Regions:
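Hydrophobic beta-strand-centered segment that forms part of the acyl-chain substrate-binding groove
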Residues: 97, 106-144
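Residues that form or immediately flank small-molecule/cofactor binding pockets and catalytic motifs
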Residues: 27, 79, 136
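A contiguous, surface-exposed recognition patch within enzymatic or periplasmic domains that forms
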Residues: 40-106, 113-116
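HotDog/MaoC-like acyl-thioester-processing domains
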Residues: 1-62, 139, 144-185
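Residues within alpha-helical segments
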Residues: 104, 111, 178-180
Length: 185
């Protein structure tokens, strides 16, 4: 697991305006805990609790958004050159039936659904957003975002829980989603 944290600052004032925390699970990487003579040992640390992929209550809001079939190509124009998103042979070699939609695009679709359903299309109200990607999304699929109101963390904020399901496959692709909305700016 690699964890990166980055803080974005206003160019003029220097004030922090956003903090980004990115977790990457490096599948099939590792083997650094030993030498060829002494194979690596598994960690004795307890396993993390299982991730909950269901929501017991019916959602307060449901938003369906269709991803564009050409979305992966648009993201490639943004300097993401990972061939997994555009090359069918690379996708198959990695165990996927076809190229994947970028995680950032999936994340953006979930964000859009929350802002549309709960913030009257005012993106300045979004204070935080976190997700767990639980399955791949393919370009052209429909993402259904199911949103539940939660207890507010602080006065003046609105806490939300959500998940995203690909309608065509009935697969949960974002689980354990959390968002916080604030007052309009």
């Amino acid at each position: 697991m690699l964890i990166f944290e980055r803080t974005l600052h206003d160019e003029v004032t220097g004030a922090a305006i956003a903090s980004i925390e990115h977790h990457t699970l490096c599948r099939a990487d590792g083997g650094f805990a030993g030498t060829a003579a002494t194979p690596p040992q598994r960690s004795s640390a307890p396993a993390r609790p299982p991730v909950e992929n269901t929501q017991d209550e019916p959602p307060d809001h449901v938003v369906d958004i269709v991803s564009l079939p050409q979305a992966a190509l648009i993201y490639r124009l943004s300097a993401d050159r990972n061939p997994l998103h555009v090359d069918p042979d690379v996708a198959r070699a990695a165990g996927f039936p076809r190229p994947l939609l970028h995680g950032l695009c999936t994340y953006g679709i979930a964000c859009r659904a929350i802002v549309q359903a709960c913030a009257a299309n005012d993106a300045t109200r979004l204070r935080s957003l976190s997700v767990r990607f639980s399955a791949p999304v393919y370009p052209g699929e429909t993402l259904r975002t199911e949103i539940l109101h939660d207890e507010a963390d602080r006065p003046g904020t609105q806490a939300l829980r959500f998940r995203c399901i690909v309608q065509e496959r009935g697969t949960v692709v974002i689980s354990n989603g959390r968002a916080t909305l604030g007052e309009p700016e």
